Amino acid sequence: SGGLQVKNFDFTVGKFLTVGGFINNSPQRFSVNVGESMNSLSLHLDHRFNYGADQNTIVMNSTLKGDNGWETEQRSTNFTLSAGQYFEITLSYDINKFYIDILDGPNLEFPNRYSKEFLPFLSLAGDARLTLVKE
């Protein structure tokens, strides 16, 4: 359950960011986060295979205060990822919302609650091995 953090990332309004890789064989969860830092996340995209009370659920949220500042979650049970499989997620955003395109899966939207136009921080954490990050 390693993690990757990229700082000084050039993810601005109108650009696309694609991350891909392989899900572990017995996953609990993995998340993709974009924002200004680990404590200021405009999008927390958490795939929960089997985590707490959640099974096969995508949870999206945001925070300006790290773990003490989580806002209202948005959830989707349109869950198409599975253990051991390749995944690819493409993100883009504008001043109002994020657009999330999961390969062979749902297209989701999430509000850009803080109206940020420059998100230099990317992190990936949890039960997946990253093989692709491209802008």
Curated annotation (Swiss-Prot):
Keywords associated with the record: Acetylation, Lectin
Annotated source species: Conger myriaster (Conger eel)
Example GO molecular function: carbohydrate binding
Residues binding a beta-D-galactoside, per UniProt: W70, E71, T72, E73, Q74, R75, S76
Subunit field text: Homodimer.
Domain Galectin: 3-135
S-S bonds: none
Pfam families: Gal-bind_lectin
Role played: This protein binds beta-galactoside. Its physiological function is not yet known.
Protein name (database record): Congerin-1
Modification N-acetylserine occurs at: S1
